[in-house]
Amino acid sequence: MPPLAPLDFAVIGLNHQTAPVEVREQAAVRAGDEGKVLQHLSRYAREVMLLNTCNRTEVYLAGLQGDPLRAFESGWGRALDGHLYVHRGEAAATHLYRVAAGLDSLVIGETQIQGQVKRAWQEAHARGLSGTLLNKVAQGALAAGKRVRSETGLSDKVVSVSSAAVELAEAALGELRHRTALILGAGETAELTLTHLRAAGVQDVIVVNRTEARARQLADKLGGRACAAEYLHEVLPEADVVIASSAAPHYVLHGEGVRAALAKRPERPIFLIDISVPRILDPDIRAVSGAHLYNLDDLTAIVSRNLQSRRAALPYAEAIIREAVADLLRWHLTREAQLGRRAVALASD
């Protein structure tokens, strides 16, 4: 019988640990373009999954038909090579299992990534790009992530990117109860941000979105005022803090707009926190007197401080991952042995 084949699975990508936000935004895939990217990558593997979040862009490949690095370079070029990691076989599976469990996140233990992995797999499956191996690995990763959250305290009182942004605003402004907050965007992250602002006591929240109906839907659900993006500069002078979490394909706010808003609120600064990737707040805002601009990379200190209380759960979480990956490898070896026996039987007929 021929030797058993190794796990034909790989991941290539970058994340917050290997690339700053200005590099991550170069790799980010625009909403709606995922299908086109998947179709392109399918030339390099029989099964392909794209995981694209604010802190990572990763390509998972099963049934490889070429070099993973070449596959990534074909879509993004070589400019990002110095920030990429490549894992194969067991290491690639372990990576996805840790990602789904929130162990590889900027915010360790965060729960949003579980849904993001599930949607990435469902997108691949819907396009016929997830077969036996990718299905098994993705399902195993999701199950392992669920176990980590239910059997350890890793996700207890976990801070998310959204809550870290609100905590940063509190550190800058003090109590937020009598402050006005403006949220740019109306998606999942914007909804989480509004939830945390409400929990922090903010009474006045303005939700600004390109589609006013979507802004109104979110404002009506959690409380707030809705505003179409075309009126952003009219309401901006009211805002003490701006939290941006939109998937806009360009900067929606520049230094000149912030300068004009500050002129209408003398002696009252504006704190702006951009948790979008790509960023939608122009970095030139930093040069405006009275404006204080932050991005995802500035949240690291808050995230690290929050992790201290949950650090004891990490060894238990990692043990669950090792056990789950071992189960995957046993399945793979059994499957390969069965395929090998069939091949021998067919050859002898």
UniProtKB/Swiss-Prot annotation:
**Superkingdom as given in the UniProt entry:** Bacteria
Q: Which Gene Ontology molecular function entries are recorded, alphabetically?
A: glutamyl-tRNA reductase activity; NADP binding
Q: In which pathway does it act?
A: Porphyrin-containing compound metabolism; protoporphyrin-IX biosynthesis; 5-aminolevulinate from L-glutamyl-tRNA(Glu): step 1/2
EC top class named in words:
oxidoreductase
Feature type site, description Important for activity: 95
**Pfam families on file:** GlutR_N, Shikimate_DH
Which positions are annotated as binding substrate?
53-56, 105, 110-112, 116
Membrane-traversing stretches: none
Please give the NCBIfam families that the UniProt record associates with this protein: hemA
Report quaternary structure and partners: Homodimer.
Function in brief: Catalyzes the NADPH-dependent reduction of glutamyl-tRNA(Glu) to glutamate 1-semialdehyde (GSA).
Q: Domain note for this entry?
A: Possesses an unusual extended V-shaped dimeric structure with each monomer consisting of three distinct domains arranged along a curved 'spinal' alpha-helix. The N-terminal catalytic domain specifically recognizes the glutamate moiety of the substrate. The second domain is the NADPH-binding domain, and the third C-terminal domain is responsible for dimerization.
What's this protein's name? Glutamyl-tRNA reductase
Highest classification ranks of the organism: Bacteria, Thermotogati, Deinococcota, Deinococci, Deinococcales
Q: Which gene encodes it?
A: hemA
